[in-house]
Amino acid sequence: MDDIFTQCREGNAVAVRLWLDNTENDLNQGDDHGFSPLHWACREGRSAVVEMLIMRGARINVMNRGDDTPLHLAASHGHRDIVQKLLQYKADINAVNEHGNVPLHYACFWGQDQVAEDLVANGALVSICNKYGEMPVDKAKAPLRELLRERAEKMGQNLNRIPYKDTFWKGTTRTRPRNGTLNKHSGIDFKQLNFLAKLNENHSGELWKGRWQGNDIVVKVLKVRDWSTRKSRDFNEECPRLRIFSHPNVLPVLGACQAPPAPHPTLITHWMPYGSLYNVLHEGTNFVVDQSQAVKFALDMARGMAFLHTLEPLIPRHALNSRSVMIDEDMTARISMADVKFSFQCPGRMYAPAWVAPEALQKKPEDTNRRSADMWSFAVLLWELVTREVPFADLSNMEIGMKVALEGLRPTIPPGISPHVCKLMKICMNEDPAKRPKFDMIVPILEKMQDK
């Protein structure tokens, strides 16, 4: 079968769908020139494939090696329907490539009049200069030039030249396609791992920053007592299900090995510069999580969980809390598969009871509706996002577990919280597990909240 880039170029929707259905395939990977599948589908005008990729979570503002986004390519080639689709999904209309050109530069240069008009109608700047001092309207033929200037002026744009500055994109993050080879290695040679710095150590093991095949990674070395042939076999059997590359809000395990001399089971995952959601909210990272970013994180997590809940059987022993949600370099929240517990890791032990549903604290896992219990955990995450507080921070884990399970301890919603978030929190934290919504039901609610 041809590679995914060829299938997207040629518009082979059936082959693309089959490829996307394999959870080990990463739809945000790049080819040798940094083109993602979405770049190719937009360049070649493959609307059905573009729609499919966006629905599955392709990154809209991903940049190739020349810093072109999919919108640059769709605008250059005059694919008006795709331009409108990308704008609908919040494509950056004034994204700057390595030459300082925005999509409107290309629409004007190639005479894509209707696309140029659409871009201006949606806020594209007509006077922004590239590295060579040229504005988009300088590239347009006379009639289009006058029309665009007139439209821009009516929309309140200042028509004075906006000089090119290297700082146009500073403070924003440039999103590159991921290395497409990383998902090919499930078994990893421990000798190839370069351990750089220990990040953390707790009951379950050690966390290290490392390098592998030229990529920054996180290495998780598990602490397991009485390692045996049976535990080794269970580890090798359970790992492959954690290699989920097909959803942008799920962070896969890249691979695994057993570290000598005493075999320590070891997991490798992508390096996340911001760490976990817990780090971002409670440990003084450099940015503020305002209301709109909080809703964005909530939407990311809901999408990731909606996807995980489609898997049959469910991934067992996955606990949703702010330490098991990682924050990507472009501020995307991703559910970490490296935090899923293995069958041999302290069965029955709860290490983060503040996020656990009361019924899950009271009953055995097999007697609990996992999907409903996850929704309770999500409600606690919503509370954490809007209050910026650690739930029940003044109590020990033992006290939290007992009080939530037996004494009705619940997070209290402080005044001043958005009524929409407040209502959603209450719905998701219904005392009756059967009355809690499913994740695919709350995704559209969060999308509406984000649009506001």
From Swiss-Prot:
It holds the Pfam family PK_Tyr_Ser-Thr. The modification N-acetylmethionine is found at residue 1. GO terms for molecular function: ATP binding; integrin binding; magnesium ion binding; protein domain specific binding; protein kinase activity; protein kinase binding; protein-containing complex binding; protein-macromolecule adaptor activity. GO terms for cellular component: axon; cell cortex; cell-cell junction; centrosome; chromatin; costamere; cytoplasm; dendritic shaft. It comes from Rattus norvegicus. Component of the heterotrimeric IPP (ILK-PINCH-PARVIN) complex composed of ILK, LIMS1/PINCH and PARVA; the complex binds to F-actin via the C-terminal tail of LIMS1 and the N-terminal region of PARVA, promoting F-actin filament bundling. Formation of the IPP complex is dependent on protein kinase C and precedes integrin-mediated cell adhesion and spreading. ILK also interacts with LIMS2/PINCH2 and with PARVB and PARVG which may substitute for LIMS1 and PARVA in the IPP complex; PARVA and PARVB compete for the same binding site. Keywords: Acetylation, ANK repeat, ATP-binding, Cell junction, Cell membrane, Cell projection, Cytoplasm, Cytoskeleton, Magnesium, Membrane, Metal-binding, Nucleotide-binding, Nucleus, Phosphoprotein, Repeat. PROSITE patterns: ANK_REP_REGION (PS50297), ANK_REPEAT (PS50088), PROTEIN_KINASE_DOM (PS50011). Its main location: other. Scaffold protein which mediates protein-protein interactions during a range of cellular events including focal adhesion assembly, cell adhesion and cell migration. Regulates integrin-mediated signal transduction by contributing to inside-out integrin activation. It is a peripheral membrane protein. This is Scaffold protein ILK. InterPro entries: Ankyrin_rpt, Ankyrin_rpt-contain_sf, Kinase-like_dom_sf, PK_ILK, Prot_kinase_dom, Ser-Thr/Tyr_kinase_cat_dom, Ser/Thr_Kinases-Pseudokinases. Residues 180-212 are annotated as: PH-like. ANK repeats lie at residues 2-30, 31-63, 64-96, 97-129, 130-174. GO terms for biological process: branching involved in ureteric bud morphogenesis; caveola assembly; cell differentiation; cell morphogenesis; cell population proliferation; cell projection organization; cell-matrix adhesion; establishment or maintenance of epithelial cell apical/basal polarity. Mg(2+) binds at residue 339. It is found in: Cell junction, Focal adhesion; Cell membrane; Cell projection, Lamellipodium; Cytoplasm, Myofibril, Sarcomere. The keyword Nuclease does not apply. The modification Phosphothreonine is found at residue 173. Residues 193-446 form the Protein kinase domain. ATP binds at residues 200, 202-204, 270, 272, 279, 341. The modification N6-acetyllysine is found at residue 426. Belongs to the protein kinase superfamily. TKL Ser/Thr protein kinase family.
